[in-house]
Regions:
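Conserved glycine-rich Rossmann-like NAD(P)H-binding loop of the short-chain dehydrogenase/reductase
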Residues: 35-52
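The beta1-alpha1 cofactor-binding region of Rossmann-like NAD(H)/NADP(H)-dependent oxidoreductases
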Residues: 46-47, 67-81, 126
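Active-site beta-alpha loop architecture of Rossmann-like, nucleotide-cofactor-dependent enzymes
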Residues: 23, 96, 100-104
Length: 139
């Protein structure tokens, strides 16, 4: 059974957390920092990930925040180089980036007959669905 905070000592380990601007992955980043890890927090939302990194640093932990779109290989490569320089080689990767997109969501998932103006499966934006697929499967 997992006990929080983490009881394992991660001192000296570099933990990279994608999606760290969100609630779940932000808490994972915080837990690893509290357990002694040097944390690289990545997120598409630069403001959120920089705020998390600042909070953890103010609490005495080692954390760097990086803005990156995990669907863009060049951004990931650039952030990887910065992490190597700032914190060292990644020991643990929490590949937590994911989510949904309004363009890939229907108005009512259990509706049998669509009402005028409601988005059904057949009305979904293919680019929105593709974005969600790539983010959650490839990202």
């Amino acid at each position: 059974m997992l006990e929080l905070p983490l009881k394992t000592d991660f001192t000296g380990k570099v933990v990279v957390v994608t999606g760290a601007g969100g609630v779940l992955c932000g808490d994972m980043a915080r837990a690893f920092a509290q357990a002694g890890a040097k944390v690289a927090a990545l997120d598409l939302n630069e403001d959120k990930v920089k705020k998390l990194a600042e909070e953890l640093k103010n609490e005495g932990f080692v954390c760097e925040g990086y803005a990156a779109n995990v669907l863009e290989a060049e951004q990931v490569k650039a952030v990887h180089a910065r992490i190597l320089e700032d914190l060292g080689k990644c020991d643990i990767l929490i590949n937590g980036a994911g989510g949904n997109n309004k363009r890939a969501t229907t108005d009512n998932e259990y509706q049998h007959e669509a009402k005028a103006g409601q988005t059904t499966f057949f009305d979904l934006d293919t680019e929105g669905v593709d974005f969600v697929f790539r983010l959650n499967f490839q990202g």
